[in-house]
């Protein structure tokens, strides 16, 4: 099908749980992509993790052939996008390959902050956005209110939004018809030199690097020599094709199409995402505007439990970085935990997902330290440095000013939960920016310290609003704050992996809470274990894990008191000696205790 006017490239924008993966399943079923037997729920969420959590993490693509009512068969290239705030860069990658997007909104819940953010991204990239109301079969569906919300909050016309229910299949054909009519066809010239954008790439143990590309101009077929613009290397194409949703090889990929290219690239970083491909005969094709590198917001140390796994761990991280360009890592060593990596993530969910993927897909046992954000420090010498690890913090006497990252958070919440949300934001040292009443929902925007957001803000927000509030945030600026480093000492030895950077006002409270928590988690030893929290040289909190004691007098029946005293003295001497040489094993839960401080 070479006619460009019959191709439609689109993606779906939706908040978590508004039914985009189910809608995708319906599309695949209606266009006959899979037989009844192969149909299973959430076909595109291929990672077990995605299925379990019910979220889409990676972008996927599917090519479907839809015979419309006007008798023309259209090629629909559908690129699935994640909906969670941590994966916004995946969304911008998917959108860069499309001409249009379906904005799917749950007719019961209404517009959520996430869809608003992604929708703006789509509009900025010049895409045609088409609203769809999903879950119309639910009793609480209220299409008129939701249409009004779409118009008020996002500002696109929703008077003729298509109503459907992906679960029952009602109105899905109407969605496809409208899609073919409203979303523009791709532009591009098949005769021009090849120019293709890499949307995603992943590593296959047999095939090497598999790249998902959107061809802008020209064509590419098996046996072509392609040039990767950023590395300048040449590769021979082994096969090209599309996913429908299974791998299907095709003769070639032409302008306007989305598909995969396998070129036997063995080097993991041989085809970076956002790069441009062209033929070796036309090396001077312009580079397409790629995606911007996203800066990680949250850093945490990851350490293998057994130090023999270090090399496997490094390899696993390399493979994951290919598929997930926002993950960054640097080697790090800790006195308590040995060698590992300091990894940068986009947010807490991203961190959990990466850790689970490492443990599942690469069978590693990992210990994670508490996450921190990047702080900007102005030293007395006048230079500015950035610190992402509390144990790397220079001495307080050398620091002129400490600045913490502030994020601008947009929260959409139903009016009845507004009070709780405001209380939570104040507790997290937030400063209110503005408040808009939009029908039954309220949009509040706050400036919050990122340090407070990364720990448990999202979970707390969900619980105070009974799951109705939705959050979208982005980094805004660095701002001076009175911050201190809180060290944890176990038996008078600092444990570097447990250090935290906190606001001075919260330091005593945090120190107390942390030592109490550690007391529960550190197993009792044969001697007393002192757990202390200190700021510099000043101890702000202390608890003691009491010793286990063997009753050495059990074998004495009567007899002289000096015999008993001798045994007790002997035990005392043994305990004293033990305390000098004994070391305390700190369990994995203790390192994460920091996260669960109320």
Swiss-Prot record:
UniProt signal peptide: none
Enzyme category, top tier: hydrolase
UniProt EC number: 3.6.5.n1
Source superkingdom: Bacteria
Protein family membership: Belongs to the TRAFAC class translation factor GTPase superfamily. Classic translation factor GTPase family. LepA subfamily.
HAMAP family according to UniProt: LepA
Name under which the protein is recorded: Elongation factor 4
Species of provenance: Pseudomonas syringae pv. syringae (strain B728a)
Lineage, broadest ranks: Bacteria, Pseudomonadati, Pseudomonadota, Gammaproteobacteria, Pseudomonadales
Gene responsible for this protein: lepA
């Amino acid at each position: 099908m070479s006619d460009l006017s019959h191709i439609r490239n689109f993606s779906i924008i939706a908040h978590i749980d508004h039914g985009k993966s189910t809608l995708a399943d319906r599309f695949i079923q209606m266009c006959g992509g899979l037989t009844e037997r192969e149909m299973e729920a959430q076909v595109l969420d291929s990672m077990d993790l995605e299925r379990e959590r019910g979220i889409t993490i990676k972008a996927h693509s599917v090519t479907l052939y839809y015979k419309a009512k006007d008798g023309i068969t259209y090629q629909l290239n559908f690129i699935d996008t994640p909906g969670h705030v941590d994966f916004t860069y995946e969304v911008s990658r998917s959108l860069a390959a499309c001409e249009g997007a379906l904005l799917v909104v749950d007719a019961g819940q209404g517009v959520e902050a996430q869809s608003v953010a992604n929708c703006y991204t789509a509009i900025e990239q010049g895409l045609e956005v088409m609203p769809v109301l999903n879950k119309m079969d639910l009793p609480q569906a209220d299409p008129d209110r939701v249409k009004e919300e779409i118009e008020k909050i996002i500002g696109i016309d929703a008077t003729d939004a298509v109503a459907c229910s992906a679960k029952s299949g009602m109105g899905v054909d109407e969605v496809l018809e409208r899609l073919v009519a409203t979303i523009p066809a791709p532009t591009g010239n098949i005769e021009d030199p090849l120019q293709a954008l890499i949307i995603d790439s992943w590593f296959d143990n047999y095939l090497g690097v598999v790249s998902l590309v959107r061809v802008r101009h020209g064509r590419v077929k098996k046996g072509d020599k392609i040039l990767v613009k950023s590395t300048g290397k040449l590769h021979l194409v082994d096969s090209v094709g599309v996913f429908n949703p299974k791998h299907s090889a095709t003769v070639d990929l032409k302008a306007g199409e989305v598909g995969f290219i396998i070129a036997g690239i063995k080097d993991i970083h041989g085809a970076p995402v956002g790069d441009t491909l062209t033929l070796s005969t036309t090396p001077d094709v312009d580079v397409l505007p790629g995606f911007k590198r996203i800066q990680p917001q949250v850093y945490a140390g990851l350490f293998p439990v057994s130090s023999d796994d270090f090399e496997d761990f490094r390899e696993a991280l390399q493979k994951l970085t290919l598929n997930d360009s926002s993950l960054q890592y640097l080697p790090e060593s800790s006195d308590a935990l040995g060698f590992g990596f300091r990894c940068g993530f986009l947010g807490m969910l991203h961190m959990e997902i990466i850790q689970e993927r490492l443990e599942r897909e690469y069978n590693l046992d990992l210990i994670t330290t508490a996450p921190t954000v990047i702080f900007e420090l102005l030293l007395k010498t006048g230079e500015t440095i950035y610190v992402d690890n509390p144990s790397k913090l220079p001495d307080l006497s050398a620091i002129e000013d400490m600045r913490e990252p502030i994020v601008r958070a947009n929260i959409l919440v139903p009016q009845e939960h507004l009070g709780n949300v405001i209380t939570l934001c104040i507790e997290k040292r937030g400063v209110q920016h503005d408040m808009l009443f939009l029908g039954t929902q309220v949009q509040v925007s706050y400036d919050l310290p990122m340090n407070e957001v990364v720990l448990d803000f999202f979970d707390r927000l969900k619980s105070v609003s009974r799951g109705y509030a939705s959050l979208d945030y982005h980094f805004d600026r660095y701002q001076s704050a009175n911050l201190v480093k809180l060290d944890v000492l176990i038996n008078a030895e600092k444990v570097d992996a447990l250090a935290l950077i906190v606001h001075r006002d919260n330091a005593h409270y945090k120190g107390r809470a942390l030592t109490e928590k550690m007391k529960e988690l550190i197993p009792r030893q044969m001697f007393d274990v002192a757990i202390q929290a200190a700021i510099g040289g000043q101890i702000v909190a202390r608890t003691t894990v009491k010793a286990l004691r063997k009753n050495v007098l059990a074998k004495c029946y009567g007899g002289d008191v000096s015999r008993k005293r001798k045994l007790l003295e002997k035990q005392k001497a043994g305990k004293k000696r033990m305390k000098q040489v004994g070391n305390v094993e700190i369990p994995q839960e203790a390192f994460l205790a920091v996260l669960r401080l109320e």
